[in-house]
Amino acid sequence: TLSAKGKHVIVIGGGDTGSDCVGTSNRQGAASVTQLEIMPKPPEKEDKAMTWPHWPLKLRTSSSHEEGAERDWAVLTKRVVGENGDVTGLECVRIEWDGRSFEEVPGSEFTLKADLILLAMGFTGPKRRGLLDKAGVALCERGNVKADTQRYATDQDGVFACGDMRRGQSLVVWAIREGRQCARAVDEALMGVTDLPR
């Protein structure tokens, strides 16, 4: 079984799953735990006028974090370093965000010691390069594929979108629900009628 006992653990991802990895690593007796997040450090308190009715953007410290971990933001992981098939470190660089994309900060490269790297990365939006660019679908203000919630149709004929691609990062139950509804919409678009459940 996989254990963090006595290891230098790096958790890549700053969300709830990352927090769970931090807590589990501490309880298993990790030598050190470092949590990295690609996004900038959120403010200590949310701007209530700017966030309602959306989930507020603010720094969250869970009980897992209180157990102990180094936390670092605006960090891009570049390369896993290893020796004889074992992980020994993680090469990283600091980044600056302009609101939609980031640039590496020249001269900010650093390497962290690591025996165990846990991937707990979230979703920052659909990748545009490739299929989305070629399809020419419209994007919403958040950078997700714009599609209605009845037929899941985009502005391009015969192209549909649902789940995280359409609504952004969310719970898997939403992706499942929208996937089923979108399948029904596609079936109806192709066949003219559908007997798939909604």
Language-model segment annotations:
Residues 1, 63-70, 74-115:
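A structured beta-alpha segment of the ubiquitous adenosine-cofactor-binding alpha/beta core
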Residues 14, 37-41, 164:
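Cofactor-binding loop segments of dinucleotide-utilizing enzymes, especially the Rossmann-like FAD-
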Residues 18-23, 28, 162-196:
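A conserved FAD-binding loop/helix module that cradles the flavin
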Residues 1-6, 98-169:
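FAD-site-proximal beta/loop scaffold in flavoenzymes
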Residues 4-15:
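Beta1/beta-strand and adjacent pyrophosphate-binding region of the FAD-binding site
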Residues 11, 92, 119:
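Redox-cofactor binding/interface segments in oxidoreductases and associated redox assembly factors
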Residues 17-21, 41-45, 79-81, 97-99, ...:
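Flexible loop/turn segments at secondary-structure boundaries
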Residues 22-79, 193-198:
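Rossmann-like dinucleotide-binding cores of NAD(P)H-dependent redox enzymes
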